[in-house]
């Protein structure tokens, strides 16, 4: 495996991150110098990183019980705990079943410390609500199609749930140690999985305004308030894109971190990276060798039918379309989704360099078929499911 890809996956690994930050002793867990005593610990792990996060504690704790909720299709057994498959990104009956099992566990089991392991995807994987499933599904479908931002959609979702927006804490009979692997650009931890154990600053009135804005005011009657203060959960960020980029900075040549919050059109981001390479000598004062690092979640706007593609594939095609090749420099661009899946493909991302030539590139750009093109030239990255997600990582080496 290519060294850069290997390092990205290693630096994104929740098990390794936990091992660096968490000390487990016979009767206490220590996180960044904070001590959490226990005699009967329990685990609830939910999200794309739940398997590796749970495995760390299962390996380290002699006696532990709990639930681990994974995306459907990524099932893998674990000792000592029950593993539940649910759906992502859509809420389904499996989401409600998972949420119900979590509440039953919290109410009925005997534990004196709840270790809550949270990562991206949890919002869909686990739900518990007074709103009937069919109605909640209808609301979610309409929200997704409404043109609202992800933040606006999540505000509404929190106010329709009995466990999002800090409300899961109401069901725990013991202190909660929340450890978080974040996929949210910008660092808002309450947005990870809709923050089941974190306080939320948004209000019912905020959610009403959002629903009215897109003609869904009829659903306002289902809104409930989120928790503004949480006193029984202690929350720690264990891993995110900024941590990964800082570690990459230590191993590459002359690193420059562009941003950890890349958003907007994926193709345009690739075009912008090409522009940096094209003008680095005259405009930016950059001289090879240097390495540009970035992370985030650019998007792809689909109109009509699309082929096999994803945001990272589009970044690579945008870059290849516009980068100027000459004998003065060489380049290599890595674009990888740390969860192992980019778009509707089986690939995590792609690697392209000055020798990568895609014939008829405009066709693949406009048909959103980036991986059909990149497969043909052997520039795809296939990792399989990685059991983590800190979003997308971009590394551009210029030599």
Swiss-Prot record:
TM annotation in the entry: none
Gene3D superfamilies: Glycerate kinase, MOFRL-like N-terminal domain, MOFRL domain
Note describing how the cofactor binds: Magnesium. It could be replaced to some extent by nickel, manganese, cobalt, calcium, zinc or strontium.
Listed GO CC annotations: cytoplasm
EC number(s) from the headed UniProt entry: 2.7.1.165
Binding site for substrate: 48
Activity at various pH: Optimum pH is 4.5. More than 70% of the optimum activity remains at pH between 3 and 7.
Reaction equation(s) it catalyzes: (R)-glycerate + ATP = (2R)-2-phosphoglycerate + ADP + H(+)
Domain of life assignment: Archaea
Family under the similarity heading: Belongs to the glycerate kinase type-1 family.
Record function comment: Catalyzes the ATP-dependent phosphorylation of D-glycerate to 2-phosphoglycerate. It can also utilize GTP, CTP, UTP, ADP, AMP or pyrophosphate as phosphate donor.
Name by which UniProt lists this protein: Glycerate 2-kinase
Encoding gene, per UniProt annotation: gck
